[in-house]
UniProtKB/Swiss-Prot annotation:
Chain's gene name: uxaC
Pathway: Carbohydrate metabolism; pentose and glucuronate interconversion
Stored InterPro entries: Metal_Hydrolase (IPR032466), Uronate_isomerase (IPR003766)
Organism in which the protein naturally occurs: Yersinia enterocolitica serotype O:8 / biotype 1B (strain NCTC 13174 / 8081)
Matching Pfam families: UxaC
GO biological process per UniProt: D-galacturonate catabolic process; D-glucuronate catabolic process
Domain of life of the organism encoding this protein: Bacteria
The entry's keywords: Isomerase
Name recorded for this polypeptide: Uronate isomerase
Gene Ontology molecular function terms on file: glucuronate isomerase activity
């Protein structure tokens, strides 16, 4: 019987242990997509306590706590920090089998060095006290934790209207050597059906100093803001395509759709598809010209609980997996980009694991141009960011494409403690390849497979994003 969370956690073959300890473990972290607040990095935030750094804003934990019968005031409400931590500690023993159980204890081990103790009501006092003692040290500031975890690059998620002053301040600080770059997230500029679209157009007009009344005006405004992002080192875009749509329209039609929306009229389903397609095609052309990477996160069903949305807002744990078809509209969208000779490097993530093979085969349709792994099937995302989900994604990527060209893991997280997800991913990767060797499905060539693991952990992403570190 294996012990829980030893140095060989998940490494169930000798070959896996060699791969992890000799090739994966000490690789730096290239976290190309996350939701860390750049302000906290710029200001080198010091966290008040374990709640402040660990539970605040964590919708994964809130979902588990609600499922465990914890009242909302202990999740997002007015309970004290310690009361919220205690509610989490009481929930943790019930999360066995959920990735939260592994994540929790990996995060206690690194960076806190708390080992041999499982979080529960019986250990809550000791862990609370020890964690808070460490957080009082300079080395446990936001930047200190990033340095402890050997992070080399972080890509935050930023709106086109953001002024990026925090990124500018970080870049100007010669004492901090981790790249913190903005990523362009223009969802609000193409979600024409959204309630806040007209208000957002006014804010975009102000940020770009451009009046927007026609489709060409919107493109001009977005182009100006992309120039601003490029000046701050941006090389990556990201888009939430909850449902993939495709529709063709000429510019006069697009002008009419935009004018009617700005006048307060809701677009039809067809008009929404036409407008979104046009914006995405314009953007992809700019990404290709600027040599940016585009990411599509596909298939979320958001804000399902209207009562809770009205009480506490979005992004607090009431989202789930969508089941809308995506193959045909996604194919047409990518094909249209290719026909314009404007298909940039692209990473596709699907939230519904049913779509793994759809994405795994779709990326193969558009590879080429002498770029290894130009089109990527992205790592297991959100509800798939767990052992089974990552194994499925990597297995299907290997079967349908080239695992060796995979750009690997990202945290997609708002927490400075989530870097152990890279460790978790690396252990799962080494476990999987080690089992292939054990079963005679891959050669026991440590240099060949070790190099492959090293590339997936760091080097492939470094080469793919082409950002100078």
């Amino acid at each position: 019987m294996a012990q829980f969370l030893t140095e060989d956690f998940l490494l169930d073959t000798e070959f896996a242990r060699r791969l992890y300890h000799d090739y994966a473990k000490d690789q730096p972290i290239y976290d190309y997509h996350c939701h860390l607040p750049p302000e906290q990095i710029a200001e080198n935030t010091r966290f008040k306590n374990l709640y402040d750094i660990w539970l605040k804003g964590d919708h994964y934990k809130w979902r588990a706590m609600r499922t465990n019968g914890v009242a909302e005031r202990f999740c997002t409400g007015d309970a004290s920090d310690r009361e919220k931590f205690d509610a989490w500690a009481a929930t943790v023993p019930h999360t066995i089998g959920n990735p939260l159980y592994h994540w929790t204890h990996l995060e206690l081990r690194r960076p806190f060095g708390i080992t041999g103790k499982l979080l529960s009501p019986a250990t809550a006092d000791e862990i609370w006290q020890r964690g808070n003692e460490l957080l009082a040290q300079d080395s446990f500031s936001a930047r200190g934790i990033m340095q402890k975890m050997n992070v080399k690059m972080v890509g935050t998620t930023d709106d086109p209207i953001d002024d990026l002053r925090h990124h500018k301040a970080i870049a100007a600080d010669g004492s901090f050597n981790i790249k913190v770059l903005p990523s362009w997230r223009p969802d609000k500029a193409f979600n024409i059906e959204a309630a806040g679209f007209n208000d957002y157009m006014q804010r975009l007009e102000a940020a770009a100093d451009t009046s927007i009344s026609r489709f060409a005006d919107l493109c001009t405004a977005l182009n100006k803001r992309m120039d601003h992002f490029a000046a701050h080192g941006c090389k990556v875009s990201d888009h939430a395509l909850d449902v993939v749509v495709y529709g063709e329209a000429d510019e006069a039609t697009l002008d009419g759709i935009l004018a009617r929306r700005l006048a307060g009229n809701q677009p039809s389903t067809e008009e929404t598809a036409q407008f979104k397609t046009a914006v995405l095609l314009f953007l992809s052309g700019e990404y290709h010209r600027r040599e940016w990477v585009q990411q599509y996160h596909i298939g979320a069903l958001r804000n399902n609980n209207s009562r809770m949305f009205n009480l506490v807002g979005p992004d607090i744990g009431f989202d789930s997996i969508n089941d809308q078809p995506l193959a045909q509209p996604l194919s047409r969208l990518l094909d249209a980009q290719g026909l314009r000779n404007a298909l940039p490097k692209t990473i596709l993530y699907c939230l519904n694991p049913r779509d793994n093979e759809v994405i795994g085969t779709m990326v193969g349709n558009f590879q080429g141009e002498g770029a290894a792994g130009k089109m990527q099937f992205g790592s297991g995302w959100w509800f798939n960011d767990q052992k089974d989900g990552m194994q499925r994604q990597m297995t299907q990527l290997a079967q349908l494409g080239l695992l060796s060209r995979f750009v690997g893991m990202l945290t997609d997280s708002r927490s400075f403690l989530s870097y152990t997800r890279h460790e978790y991913f690396r252990r799962i990767l080494c476990q999987m390849i080690g089992r292939w060797v054990e079963d005679g499905e891959a050669p026991a060539d440590i240099e060949l497979l070790g190099s492959m693991v090293k590339n997936i952990c760091f080097d492939n992403a470094k080469q793919y994003f082409a950002i100078e570190l």
